[in-house]
Amino acid sequence: MNNHMDIPWHEYTNKDSKVKIENASLTEKSSVIGRIGLMLLACGTGAWRVRSSMNTIASELNITCIADIGLTNISYTCIDGIDSHAQSLSLHNTSVNTSKLARMEDFVYHFKDECKTCTCNEIHDQLDQIESIHSSYSPIILGLA
């Protein structure tokens, strides 16, 4: 039985919108920042690295992000100087996925040059592709690691 519901990330966006992420609503920007943080946490990376990546994206989008990161959860607030948007996100499981982690780090590193001209929905499409990367190791091997 699954006690966690999937997060409908694309529902945070207007699929027909042509607004670039840098001009999008705070809710849309916040959804990207939170999803990036959650995906990194799911790869097995530490809180410092998750927070650093979330801060990098927030800075590129001209907002402030304050995050409390645990082993399986993130509570964060994004502030644009006028409004704020807060969310609490949690994972139903964690693992080590170095392939996905490498892609996520590359995504964050190149965000400024490759994503600031994308819509929020286009960014979630890119994150969907990264999220579909499976671990190179079986659960048994991961358990022995």
Model-inferred region functions:
Residues 124-132:
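Cytosolic juxtamembrane amphipathic/interface segments immediately preceding
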Residues 114, 118-125, 143-145:
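N-terminal loops that bind phosphate or other acidic moieties
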Residues 132-145:
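Core alpha-helical transmembrane segments of integral membrane proteins
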Residues 1-118:
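Soluble N-terminal domains of membrane-associated systems
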Residues 32-35, 129-130, 145:
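Short, hydrophobic/aliphatic alpha-helical segments
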